[in-house]
């Protein structure tokens, strides 16, 4: 199961939140971003229950104030490799 999660953090906590989240093996990509959200993560888990477990951890984090989750629809799209 793959999902993208957008995260809002308490002001000034973004660097610490990113450092802590980097320790979770399910997170395969993490970036600080500008805009409505502060952090963008991509996760992979063996099943939907794994996504729920990650969301529970995120929502219980004292510096995470909001999340927005997008589950990947398999068979629609995928990575696009571009040659220079």
Each language-model region and where it sits:
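A compositional/biophysical signature of low hydrophobicity enriched in polar/charged and small residues
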Residues: 1-84
